[in-house]
Amino acid sequence: MFEIHPVKKVSVVIPVYNEQESLPELIRRTTKACESLGKEYEILLIDDGSSDNSAHMLVDASQAEGSHIVSILLNRNYGQHSAIMAGFSHVTGDLIITLDADLQNPPEEIPRLVAKADEGYDVVGTVRQNRQDSWFRKTASKMINRLIQRTTGKAMGDYGCMLRAYRRHIVDAMLHCHERSTFIPILANIFARRAIEIPVHHAEREFGESKYSFMRLINLMYDLVTCLTTTPLRMLSLLGSIIAIGGFSIAVLLVILRLTFGPQWAAEGVFMLFAVLFTFIGAQFIGMGLLGEYIGRIYTDVRARPRYFVQQVIRPSSKENE
């Protein structure tokens, strides 16, 4: 049996991108939730290249008297998951909680995640109840969740919810993975011995708009499909085999019909031939696109460029910048 260590210090990691309107309330509510734990805690806010006043607000929050906030400033926008990984590299707690800055997932849920982690779970995920998102966002999320479950075999209900808790050894394992395209919830489940999901509230977004546009959702889908599994390549091979067998069967059938009914009938089968041709061409383009995605990711990983660059770190215990 593995020994269950009680949680002594909690680190809350929050990526921030153009969230100046929600930051004061985010800091207040997150601090209050952490204070109620009766444990040591720190709140790491990672500015992901914001173009508004978010970075300055984070610095001020870190330098306030009695602050528990660590501000990490990235030199440009790298994306949500890269920003979270930057936060992971600076945590000091033995339980790490991730949270979005838009307050749609209430910080008041943090004590529930800590309590569940204290039961011995490596990863505590969450499922949003009564989602307050648009029809498009909810539909896209359902499709992505089903796609992930089928391609990875990991049966989790809501991969899109970033309100999650990870034991320190899970975070350390993820930090040893150097691929640039990373989807943290799936990566964490690969290393987790015990994982669980709990239902959480989901509120409407009070400030600003979602940072995930249609194209960013498409990019996220490609990341999910190609960065953690080779299942699409296997499916492509299976699909190619089915199409090839089907095309060969149709060709044989056309030859038999021509021999049976004469060349006059064959002229009327031109459209069928075109349909078969277009099917093959379409399948080739799909295959080339997927292979291109994998080759592109191999090229990116071979270059071994860092997934993020930390420009500045401000800790509350010292007014000096790292």
Curated annotation (Swiss-Prot):
Top-rank taxon: Bacteria
The protein's Enzyme Commission number: 2.4.2.53
Membrane topology: Multi-pass membrane protein
GO cellular component: plasma membrane
Periplasmic side: 257-269
NCBIfam families associated with the record: PRK10714.1 (NF007986)
Family according to the record: Belongs to the glycosyltransferase 2 family.
Protein name (database record): Undecaprenyl-phosphate 4-deoxy-4-formamido-L-arabinose transferase
Species name: Escherichia coli O7:K1 (strain IAI39 / ExPEC)
